[in-house]
Amino acid sequence: MDGKKREVENGKNGNNIKDGNSSNTTNYGKDTKTTQTIKDVKDVKSVKKAFKELQEWLREKMKKEGLVRFMKDGYPLEFVEEDVVYFLGSRKRPNLKDFIKGITLVRTYAKLRERRKQFHKRSKKPIVKKYSAPKYTRVVAYMYRVLEEKGYTPDDRKRLIVYFFNFIKPDYMSNAGIYVCLEKFRTAKFLRNKKIEELRKELIKEIPPHLFLQIEAFLSLFPTFKRKKAT
């Protein structure tokens, strides 16, 4: 994967993401006509501008793909039921067209849960070895902890992480990789107890700047829910 350029094309709305170690250049979409080289950004003002542009690109992308309901009211029960029924009768990987209909989040998450069964049929050693690098688990741990702090339920946290790596950054981690990293995070007390700011500092050192910026912009789109005080 290193040294190779990855291109993810959304044929419906014309958005491209190109990531390569040589330039780390991200094209946020044909509509905005904005190209920002994150690696070359030095001053704080430029970083804020790039972050805002990426936020807008993600927000528009998510509106078009149906996740806007998740940002407003959470995931309605009727869609959960529809997804579960659909998934039980189909093993086909969800595509972008399905997602636009608004019935893919739970289905993708259900596919993730099925990884445990698949591991019994074939050796999971190659997958576990591939995602044994700390950077993968820290990415998942950081996203999980931030969403936890914002007040999202465990299932919602996992669904959003799955969404990010299926539709925003599909070349970084597979569903099997997410499963492995979530299992590691679940059993790693040092990650669960570590402060979010500490995780953030470690992550900045381990992953490319453009990827960290995408993660931060993605997480910032979701509101913080007010927690009820114990009486």
UniProtKB/Swiss-Prot annotation:
Q: Which UniProt keywords apply?
A: Plasmid
Q: Where is the composition biased (Polar residues)?
A: 25-35
Give me the ranges of the annotated region Disordered: 1-35
Compositional bias (Basic and acidic residues) at which positions?
Answer: 1-10
The source's domain of life comes to Bacteria
**Regions of compositional bias (Low complexity) in chain numbering:** 11-24
Name under which the protein is recorded: Uncharacterized protein aq_aa39
Q: Which organism is it from?
A: Aquifex aeolicus (strain VF5)
